[in-house]
From Swiss-Prot:
Protein name: Probable alpha-1,6-mannosyltransferase MNN11
A single GO molecular function term of this UniProt record: alpha-1,6-mannosyltransferase activity
Comment field (misc): Present with 3480 molecules/cell in log phase SD medium.
Gene3D superfamilies listed in its UniProt record: Spore Coat Polysaccharide Biosynthesis Protein SpsA, Chain A
Membrane-protein topology: Single-pass type II membrane protein
Keyword Glycosyltransferase in record: yes
Primary subcellular site in the record, as a coarse category: Golgi
């Protein structure tokens, strides 16, 4: 038997139900009633929006709540010149003060003392400097405030910035002056920037604050600081303090960044590090080179002088090298730890290897050998044309290992005089 509806002739629609509800609220089913109803709804939504923004302002500005980027210090000082280097004449006073006298020290649970950096500390104003007669205080603030300098002039922005670390504890004033003047002379010839920092400025950032053990990993810290100080620079050229730029007439653009020159200097199909199964690529796009770094005579990465682009790939490498886990890893390497870390990432990340040009030492860091530097026809560091040792006309002379030999001051001084004579 078919089921019949209980009520005949009655139909229900959403329109009739809506109309009954509309009438119960006191609105007539005409044009005026509809407008009145919509006006009330609009007013309610507006009031809700107004009070939600008043009591919950974070929801309105969530996309713009990030603090401005900064380096080690929050408060920065605009630099008037693209040549940023410290007051080297303060070396005698800094030696007298020692590193402990420059920072606040904190006693740790294990009884050790750590140097502490105050990133929020303000720089000493010109008025305060004029009123201060304490020479020690002025030198201390000059040391601490130097890291706050940033260059933001867009009309005179350098394409390349030469970066170097200097050490007031282990080097004498004369040697430091020669190193700094060498970088300034080279940069001025090619309209480059200069970014030189005291090594001791970065000690509070390190977990291991022993300078001798952590020196290599201060290099990526100063490079990252240079990238921030010169945000529009295309390339950062790091040159170790144990090296001199010998041929001041060679610019990176015409010398190393030229594809024809790079093709001659590029090491193709060779192990990334000694005895590695991972090799450099046979086919390399020169225009995509973001990192240019030499091998040493043993076939390992030489981080004493290299060029890195101030872009995504360059910053990715530097941020990787600044990771505390990597910095404190017990690298099993006979050379320096930084070179081992760079070699590691290049072997395991083919994308980054494809952006890295590993070149012969001669183009960036020719090794100086005093035994080859004899006066006469074969003098001036002649090395029978090999690609490892310094010859007259090379861009740079590296004195790598001079600290262990105790010959840094004499070798730097000797070669610096040759630059001045040329």
């Amino acid at each position: 038997m078919a089921i019949k509806p209980r009520t005949k002739g009655k139909t229900y629609s959403s329109r009739s139900v809506g109309s009954q509800w509309f009438n119960r609220l006191g609105f007539k089913q005409n044009k005026y009633g509809t407008c009145k109803f919509l006006s009330i709804i609009t007013a309610f939504v507006f009031i809700l929006y107004f009070f939600s923004n008043r009591f919950y302002p974070i929801s309105r500005s969530a996309g713009a709540s990030y603090s401005p980027s900064h380096g080690l210090y929050i408060n920065e000082i605009p630099a008037s010149s693209r040549l940023i280097y410290p007051h080297v004449e303060h070396v005698p006073v800094l030696k007298q003060m020692t590193v402990r006298g420059l920072y606040i020290t904190r006693l740790e649970v294990d009884g050790s003392k750590r140097l502490i950096l105050k990133p929020e500390e303000n720089a000493l104003t010109d008025e305060e400097k004029k009123k201060t007669t304490d020479q020690i205080l002025l030198v201390k603030h000059s040391f601490l405030d130097h890291g706050k300098l940033v260059y933001r002039k867009s009309n005179d922005a350098p394409e390349v910035v030469v970066v170097t670390l200097i050490d007031f504890e282990n080097y004498e004033l004369e040697t430091i002056i020669q190193i700094v003047q060498n970088r300034v002379d080279y940069a001025q010839k090619h309209q480059y920037g200069v970014y030189i920092r005291w090594i001791q400025e970065f000690l509070p950032v390190l977990e291991n604050q022993n300078l001798a053990e952590s020196y290599e990993f201060i290099k990526p810290l100063v490079i990252r600081a240079a990238m921030h100080a010169f945000p529009t620079a295309k390339y950062i050229h790091f040159v170790d303090q144990d090296a001199l730029l010998m041929n001041l007439d060679l610019s990176l653009q015409k010398y190393l960044l030229d594809p024809k020159i790079m093709d001659l200097a590029l090491l193709k199909n060779v192990p990334v590090v000694a005895n590695s199964n991972i090799k450099t690529y046979n086919h390399f796009e020169y225009s995509s080179a973001k990192i240019i770094i030499p091998h040493d005579a043993d076939g390992n990465i030489d981080a004493s002088s290299f060029v890195i682009a101030n872009d995504f790939y360059g910053k990715a490498l530097i941020d990787y090298l600044n990771d505390p886990l990597l910095r404190n890893f017990p690298w099993d390497n006979t050379g320096d730890k930084l070179s081992a870390a760079i070699g590691h990432i290049l072997q395991w990340h083919p994308t980054l290897l494809g952006k890295t040009a590993i070149v012969i030492p001669k183009v960036l860091a020719s090794q100086y050998d005093a035994s080859l530097d004899q006066e006469g026809e074969s003098g001036n560091g002649a090395s029978n044309g090999d690609v490892y040792h310094y010859n007259e006309g090379d861009l740079a002379a590296s004195f790598k290992g001079c600290r262990s030999r105790g010959t840094c001051a004499s070798e730097i001084g000797h070669m610096y005089q040759k630059i001045k004579k040329s």
